[in-house]
Swiss-Prot record:
It catalyses: L-glutamate 5-semialdehyde + phosphate + NADP(+) = L-glutamyl 5-phosphate + NADPH + H(+). This is Gamma-glutamyl phosphate reductase. The keyword NADP applies. It comes from Listeria innocua serovar 6a (strain ATCC BAA-680 / CLIP 11262). Belongs to the gamma-glutamyl phosphate reductase family. GO terms for cellular component: cytoplasm. One of its GO terms (molecular function) is NADP binding. Gene3D superfamilies: Aldehyde Dehydrogenase, Chain A, domain 1, Aldehyde Dehydrogenase, Chain A, domain 2. Catalyzes the NADPH-dependent reduction of L-glutamate 5-phosphate into L-glutamate 5-semialdehyde and phosphate. The product spontaneously undergoes cyclization to form 1-pyrroline-5-carboxylate. Its main location: cytoplasm. Its EC number is 1.2.1.41. Pathway: Amino-acid biosynthesis; L-proline biosynthesis; L-glutamate 5-semialdehyde from L-glutamate: step 2/2. It is found in: Cytoplasm. The keyword Amino-acid biosynthesis applies.
Length: 415
């Protein structure tokens, strides 16, 4: 708890400095950080390798090790992502509305930082930089708590970040890492209302549920991604296959990858064998319901848990449905309100799907893999919010701000 109190207090103080920093000052610091990350590539890879070795010794699946791994190319991508944040419009100070009331008061509504943001996440060291940079750009101090499996990578990245920001004249406590990765410290952080204004969990279902059950700090939930592809009877077959292969196989370990295929009964017999052939190239394990298994003889029988799981692996659950409404009901029962897709050339069916499916992002004839700040065209994001209050979907710079009313008068008093 001592580490949390010390760093929480320092973050609170730093947040006051950051709130007054100009866009020019922040961007200059971020450009320096981008260069410093590249300059420290060798040492970052050395520390990351310690995490990789430890993960392999523990028998961690390769798909999960991929989330942990840094390479020269990935560090270059992280560095480039910092520059992309520099190019984004700074929302701080933006006046979103202004008007005069009956008392002739001029009332303005402007964007301000949230204050101090806490982020609890798992085994993706790039999040250490992404989260730091987004919070910094929006004038927020941030306290990060990563997983134990990435601790050496995170400590090395934090050292580069803090040294770089300090060299640009910013407090080192603008961005901090909790190095104690125990569950007890994580739970203490969830109750750090004295210093944290908001807590954002990034990770699997277990982590997010733990945060929701234990946190007293306000939480923005970035949900798990049990995403579905529904292939309608009016779907173009090759388009559907291409989208499914992309959504499942391009990067199965991320939250916007597809986990379940729902297929209309009228096209199942024609579609499923060709789909199976396309997925064999990636050694995808198929877990199918009874009707789908009549067509896919080599598939495994799907269990109830298969409809609920975020596999994050080359595994696909498959269910044959009688109608779009059955597909919608299945998604709303088992989905995580993240990203859902329908493949159909029938306009009315597509409209019904997007109106009835409860998700942050609903796709018509496109892959779920586009649920990402950069892919959607508004820049880096801190995570994908699956809740409805404050933010929903990819959380960019604007979602890391609050608003403040500024009222100008010339002596008015209220009668």
């Amino acid at each position: 708890m001592t580490e949390l109190i010390k760093k929480g207090s320092a973050a609170k103080e730093a947040s006051q400095f950051l709130a007054q920093a100009s866009t020019k000052q922040k961007n200059a610091a971020l450009l320096n950080l981008s260069n410093d990350l590249l300059a420290h590539t060798a040492s970052l890879l050395q520390e990351n390798n310690k995490d990789i070795i430890r993960a392999r010794e523990k028998g961690t699946p390769e798909t999960m090790i991929d989330r942990l791994r840094l390479t020269e190319e990935r560090i270059k991508e992280i560095s480039d992502a910092v520059k992309q944040v520099v190019a984004l419009k700074d929302p701080i100070g933006e006046v979103t509305n202004m008007w005069k009331n009956e008392a002739e008061l001029t009332i303005g509504k402007t964007r301000v930082p949230l204050g101090v943001i806490g982020i609890i996440y798992e085994s993706r060291p790039n999040v250490t930089v992404d989260a730091s940079v987004l919070c910094f750009k929006t004038g927020n101090a941030v306290i990060l708590r990563g997983g134990s499996d990435a601790i050496d990578s995170n400590k090395a990245l934090m050292s580069v970040i803090q040294d770089s920001l300090a060299a640009s004249g910013f407090p080192r406590s603008s961005v901090q890492l909790i190095e104690d990765t125990s569950r007890e410290t994580a739970r203490d952080m969830m109750r750090l209302n004295r210093f944290l204004d908001v807590l954002i969990p990034r990770g699997g279902a277990k982590l997010i549920q733990t945060v929701l059950e234990n946190a007293t700090v306000p939480v923005i939930e970035t949900g798990t991604g049990n995403c579905h592809i529904y292939v309608d009877k009016a779907a173009e077959k090759q388009m559907a296959i291409d989208i499914l292969v992309n959504a499942k196989c391009s990067r199965p370990s991320v939250c916007n990858a597809a986990e379940t295929l729902l297929i209309h009964r009228d096209v199942a017999e024609a579609f499923l064998p060709e789909m199976e052939t396309a997925l064999k190239e990636y050694n995808v394990e198929l877990r199918a319901d009874e009707r789908a298994r009549e067509i896919l003889k080599d598939s495994k029988a799907a269990t109830e848990s298969d409809w609920e799981d975020e596999f994050l692996d080359f595994i696909l659950a498959i269910k044959v449905v009688d109608s779009v409404d059955e597909a919608i009901n299945h998604i709303n029962k088992y989905g995580t309100k993240h990203s859902e897709a329908i493949i159909s050339n029938d306009y009315a069916t597509g409209q019904a799907f997007h109106q009835k499916v409860d998700a942050a992002a609903v796709y018509i004839n496109a892959s779920t893999r586009f649920t990402d700040g950069f892919a959607m065209g508004f820049g880096a994001e801190i995570g994908i919010s699956t809740q409805k209050l404050h933010a929903r979907g990819p959380m960019g710079l604007t979602e890391l701000t609050s608003t403040k009313y500024i009222i100008f008068g010339d002596g008015q008093i209220r009668n």
